[in-house]
Amino acid sequence: KNNIETNAFKLISTKDIIGVEISGIIKNISAILSGALTANHYTDEYIQKLIELSQDEIFQITSKINCREEYRVNDKEMIKTLSSPACLGDMILTCYKDHSRNRRLGLGLINKFNLDQVLKDIGTVEGYMSTSTLYQNRKKFHIGKIVKTAHDILYNGNNPKSCLEKLFD
C-alpha cells in the first residue's frame, strides 16, 4: 500500500466487496437518470437527491444480498462504503460529467426518444444492461425506485419526465 500511494492517489481498504460492486452498478444506472434529469431541465439539486436515493438503494440491495459469510459486513462498514470514493466519489463524477456514456444516454431521454439510435450513437452503456438484469431479479435483489424508474423509461418506453416526477414523490 505505501509503495504505490502518492499525494494524489490513496488506497482505502474495505471488507465490503459486495457494497463496492453494487455501488458501481447503481452508479451507472443513476448516471442515466441524472442525464435524463438534465435533459428534462431539472436543477442540480435533483441530481443530488438522486444520489441520495441511489445510496439508499445501494444500502438496501447490499444488506439483502444473500452472500457467503466471509463477504458479509456490518451496517457500519456498509455506511463507510457509501461515503467512500468507490461509491459517492464515483457517483458524483459519473452523474455530473458528460464524458460518462451512461449520463450521455440519459441526456438523450427527452419526450419521444429513439433509444436504439441513442445507444447506437454512444456504444456500450453498462447501466442499460444492468437495469434489465437487476429488474429481472428484482425480488432477489430488493430493488427500489432507482432501478424501477430506469426500467420504466428504458424498457417500458414510459415518458421520462413523468417517470422522473414519480421518482421524487
Where are these regions (language model features)?
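Internal alpha-helical scaffold of NAD(P)-dependent oxidoreductase catalytic cores
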Residues: 1-80
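Charged/polar, low-hydrophobicity segments characteristic of intrinsically disordered regions
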Residues: 59-89, 131-137, 167-169
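Internal helical hairpin/lid segments
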Residues: 81-107
